[in-house]
Amino acid sequence: MIELLKKIFLVDLFQGLFVTFRNQNPKYIYTEQYPAERPKVAERYRGAPRLNINPDNGETLCISCNLCALACPENLIVVTSERSEVTKRKELVTFTYDTSRCMFCGLCEDACPVDALELTQDFEMASYTREGQIWDRQALEEGPRPTQYKC
């Protein structure tokens, strides 16, 4: 008998509508307007890699020790160097980093003795090709450029 009265008076319908209208209050809405408003990431977030540059002379801080490549469990970092005749030190020739295979563990960053390589808080690394995911030295020094959307 009670079930029949509930069906007649549409109790279930009104309970559902009550829940819907109760959650229409703007203070309960958690939608982010992503392209217009960039989300804040956690302080310890590890995102896009970057090769740091010495601000005094504009050269890279990398000393070509290859420790980052050895520490990487995915073997995605390739460092090549040459010994300079003038300074008798190793100089960085190429530095490639495959972001498509990276799991952003931070082991390469921890292994670097001069803090030349760091994982930034940038998270927009999408590209249309696989070749766009392989960053060379110049791309790593510049860092990712966030896409500018027109709103």
Curated annotation (Swiss-Prot):
Q: What membrane topology term does the record carry?
A: Peripheral membrane protein
For the 4Fe-4S ferredoxin-type domain, which residue ranges apply? 49-82, 93-122
Cystine crosslinks? none
Question: Where is [4Fe-4S] cluster 1 annotated to bind?
Answer: 62, 65, 68, 112
Question: Which top class of enzyme applies to this chain?
Answer: translocase
Where in or outside the cell it occurs: the entry states:
Cell inner membrane
Q: What is its EC number?
A: 7.1.1.-
Catalysed reaction equations from the record: a quinone + NADH + 5 H(+)(in) = a quinol + NAD(+) + 4 H(+)(out)
Instruction: Print the keywords alphabetically.
Output: 4Fe-4S, Cell inner membrane, Cell membrane, Iron, Iron-sulfur, Membrane, Metal-binding, NAD, Quinone, Repeat, Translocase, Ubiquinone
Matches recorded under Gene3D superfamilies: 3.30.70.3270
Q: Which PROSITE patterns match?
A: 4FE4S_FER_1 (PS00198), 4FE4S_FER_2 (PS51379)
Q: Which cofactor does it need?
A: [4Fe-4S] cluster
Q: Which InterPro entries match?
A: 4Fe4S_Fe-S-bd, 4Fe4S_Fe_S_CS, NADH_quinone_OxRdtase_chainI
For this UniProt entry, the molecular function terms from Gene Ontology, in alphabetical order, are: 4 iron, 4 sulfur cluster binding; iron ion binding; NADH:ubiquinone reductase (non-electrogenic) activity; quinone binding
* Residues annotated for [4Fe-4S] cluster 2 binding in this entry: 72, 102, 105, 108
Q: How is the cofactor bound?
A: Binds 2 [4Fe-4S] clusters per subunit.
Alphabetical list of SUPFAM superfamilies matching this protein: 4Fe-4S ferredoxins
Asked whether the UniProt record includes RNA-binding among its keywords, one would answer: no
The entry's cellular-component GO terms read: plasma membrane
PANTHER family (UniProt xref): NADH DEHYDROGENASE UBIQUINONE IRON-SULFUR PROTEIN 8, MITOCHONDRIAL, NADH-QUINONE OXIDOREDUCTASE SUBUNIT I 2
Role noted for this protein: NDH-1 shuttles electrons from NADH, via FMN and iron-sulfur (Fe-S) centers, to quinones in the respiratory chain. The immediate electron acceptor for the enzyme in this species is believed to be ubiquinone. Couples the redox reaction to proton translocation (for every two electrons transferred, four hydrogen ions are translocated across the cytoplasmic membrane), and thus conserves the redox energy in a proton gradient.
Subunit-structure text: NDH-1 is composed of 14 different subunits. Subunits NuoA, H, J, K, L, M, N constitute the membrane sector of the complex.
Per the record, the similarity remark reads: Belongs to the complex I 23 kDa subunit family.
What name appears for this protein in its UniProt entry? NADH-quinone oxidoreductase subunit I 2
